[in-house]
Amino acid sequence: MDKLEELENKINELASEIERLKAEEKENETGKLEHGDVYWFINHIGEIKLATWYGDPEDTTRYELGNAFIARWDASFKVEQLKVEAALKRFARPFEENEQNVILKYAHDTNKLLTGHHLYSQYGNIYFDSEEVAYKAIETVGEERIKKYYFGVNG
């Protein structure tokens, strides 16, 4: 990658970050969309679409389901997050009482993905039969994607 491409990528990243911060600021100010505001949502096949808020049942249902995003970046992030969770769940099984339930963990001090055993069910955890299955999931889905979209860790 040459210097020009590098700079263009950085500009695009910064533009996305500015859009996200502006949207976050607006969301913090209002807490909800107002009549005539534009927002993004994810349709039934994972495409990101633009809509105008009229407060109709379609708008409010999207909002209540967490599928109304002020910034396109947030909708894009959510699509990737859903993809990663779906890919991990292909290796998963339901929580089993009194069994070793292997989960993924993120170690902030070492920036590594680890596995752990859980005897308690916890919302949001994805459970695996064994550490081998968990590591196969990591290998298949990608460690960096899991860190970013499952654990919400940047860099």
Where are these regions (language model features)?
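Structural boundary micro-motifs
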Residues: 1-155
